[in-house]
């Protein structure tokens, strides 16, 4: 079934194949991707769209000596298969297995780690100029999708690259949404090869020299050339940055891709400066179900390729994302000032229904987190109530805007932080581990940490009622299964509650780890406090609990350093209270991909781990004796 693919263990093997066999290899590669993802889950549509492009790039360029940088990186399964990792695809996105994204420590062919968008051009330009500085003859290639081109960082890199006339940089725009280009055909293929050819480049260069003596003629020539290209391709914007624009061409046509890339490689060798190749691909290419619904097959779980995705017959728990989506629609019905904003994450953030029902109040700003935050600030200035739905890890990209444009002006923006805490198979790049530390230090900022689905809905309402910025952080997937109450009830701002009365030890839980804390407390005989807010901290409740207990434990699904536990320590110190304090949370390390439950256990944040950590630090005691004295083994 994979007779050709099984002979390819590196791009060097690929480059030894006759060109006539590449189409058959691409077909096998596509089938292998479908088979692999069906068994492990993962990104599918985007990978099916890059099969031929991946084959062509590795065939033409001398990787890994030539640097190949993939933007975002979820479309690199064909790249992984061709670079010696075919046999490990069964471990994809599993604990100890292959990452779903490029990793420098995984392969020398993964020249730059990616998972967040729009970084590839900057990285590839840095590599190209470093090679030039060191006197090394190598090329750098950045592959970036049309969605990623909406981020300002991509254009900052283009702007910088354009001033380096001789750098060996190629930017490949993988246009898989047809959002930029018109349909392509034979004329476009011919023009692309012509524009990347030696005669065209030479004639263009010589013509400019000749016309230097007659500036008006030079300007006329520029206009004529631009007009001729403009009839077929959107060249002007990229050439204005100093790139030689080529395309668009069919990204699934190897007979077009390979000669065009060979021509570009020659141009780079002759010092022609940065090159820009526009290819048009189709998400889900070659698998009809994914072609018909590329969004559904963007990141599927395991499935039968012959049947496609099947709806589960068992009723699923409501996810936090769904809780948010329903609250958003209900609050929009209640308050006409509400506007919803997303940076290109409509489905992932649960805003599909809101978009359908309130299209004029829905704003997808594209992959542009910095803009999204300040855009929300501008709306808040005019009396609207913006709700920005964004993954915790992506809000990091708009941090200056969060401080300067929102918090400094104390504007009432609600940040619905999805994917807070561990995210499972997507791993360290997508984990929402740092939002409490990076938000807690900002004046005027509130941070709510709901323990379950019902609290999530209520705390979203509380956040919306404030006249200051508030973030509500909640994890991926389902929680404890607490059904949200109807209506738009709120909870007191900055106030927690005692959920279990015990003695000796008090566990202060922030967020969904309340439930494993309650389980551990049954065996420890401990008090459990549902703190709800990392900021403002309920210091009144904290000091009351501290006065009645011998030791305190904080618990959060976030970084310990600077997190909610640190806030508790600071509050105790400010009040002059000295208590043994154990802070439990995510360790000072990047946490790899795997199942969330397994990762939490490895971090010691399941019920057994919490109990073990408390006993290790403070000694043993019996839950059946509420008056048992806590024996301290060590006190910081």
From Swiss-Prot:
EC number: 2.2.1.7
Highest rank taxon of the organism: Bacteria
Record PROSITE patterns: TRANSKETOLASE_1, TRANSKETOLASE_2
Entry's Gene Ontology cellular component terms: cytosol
Cofactor(s) of this protein: Mg(2+); thiamine diphosphate
Keywords in alphabetical order: Isoprene biosynthesis, Magnesium, Metal-binding, Thiamine biosynthesis, Thiamine pyrophosphate, Transferase
Oxidoreductase recorded as keyword: no
CDD domains for the chain: TPP_DXS, TPP_PYR_DXS_TK_like
Reaction it catalyzes: D-glyceraldehyde 3-phosphate + pyruvate + H(+) = 1-deoxy-D-xylulose 5-phosphate + CO2
An example Gene Ontology biological process: isopentenyl diphosphate biosynthetic process, methylerythritol 4-phosphate pathway
Cofactor annotation comment: Binds 1 Mg(2+) ion per subunit.
Lipid metabolism is among the record's keywords: no
SMART domains documented for this protein: Transket_pyr
UniProt cross-references to InterPro entries, sorted A to Z: Dxylulose-5-P_synthase, THDP-binding, Transketo_C/PFOR_II, Transketolase-like_Pyr-bd, Transketolase_BS, Transketolase_C, Transketolase_CS
Binding annotation for thiamine diphosphate: 74, 115-117, 147-148, 176, 287, 369
Pathway the protein contributes to: Metabolic intermediate biosynthesis; 1-deoxy-D-xylulose 5-phosphate biosynthesis; 1-deoxy-D-xylulose 5-phosphate from D-glyceraldehyde 3-phosphate and pyruvate: step 1/1
Binding site for Mg(2+): 146, 176
Similarity section: Belongs to the transketolase family. DXPS subfamily.
Description of how the protein assembles with itself and partners: Homodimer.
Purpose: Catalyzes the acyloin condensation reaction between C atoms 2 and 3 of pyruvate and glyceraldehyde 3-phosphate to yield 1-deoxy-D-xylulose-5-phosphate (DXP).
Name under which the protein is recorded: 1-deoxy-D-xylulose-5-phosphate synthase
